[in-house]
UniProtKB/Swiss-Prot annotation:
Mn(2+) binds at E129, D131, D140, H145. One of its GO terms (molecular function) is metal ion binding. Glycans are attached at N5, N18. Ca(2+) binds at D131, W133, N135, D140. Belongs to the leguminous lectin family. Binds one manganese (or another transition metal) ion and one calcium ion. The metal ions are essential for the saccharide-binding and cell-agglutinating activities. Homodimer of Alpha and Beta forms. Keywords: Calcium, Glycoprotein, Lectin, Manganese, Metal-binding, Pyrrolidone carboxylic acid. This is Lectin-4. It holds the Pfam family Lectin_legB.
Amino acid sequence: QNTVNFTYPDFWSYSLKNGTEITFLGDATRIPGALQLTKTDANGNPVRSSAGQASYSEPVFLWDSTGKAASFYTSFTFLLKNYGAPTADGLAFFLAPVDSSVKDYGGFLGLFRHETAADPSKNQVVAVEFDTWINKDWNDPPYPHIGIDVNSIVSVATTRWENDDAYGSSIATAHITYDARSKILTVLLSYEHGRDYILSHVVDLAKVLPQKVRIGFSAGVGYDEVTYILSWHFFSTLDGTNK
């Protein structure tokens, strides 16, 4: 499939079934109006040590046997609801092999195993992380941050995410683009009445990921927060660029 194009302007009016449009793994679930990535108790409070993923049920082609590589654009709105201090650990938009599974909770964001998280030879995933916890062991900067991860929890690029945005329980809009010609992955994060954040990095997705991937959202909780995806648009096309 050369082109993938879908839009969920909200999650109120769609009767999503697990595995038909959106696949839920781990603790992720559908609630009225949102995809909830991590667990809450009967009172709606966050459950610690939780991890979950919500992904598009059809695979996305990143490249083909003729040498074409795909460009893509995705936008989504999310709410990272903070229930007090401390709060951890954040969420990520990811691309991974279609048979990949949800991994460890906390700072691993459901994308990595703790034994191999920092070893690029043991992982196959590219992610844009929105990280609310400082993990010094992984060379995190000393503040909440947006990062680009390539086969490792140790980000190849980061930018500061100001505390009042990261912990403010405000709806954020993310735009992520990948240009197959320049091989530049870019993320723009914005708030309606606040700041904009931008981060870019060169990564050749055709060299680090398989031909077909699973795309979606992953989150891990160490402390008191819950992640909700409120809308999602995605478009990709094999545009003829030689990979």
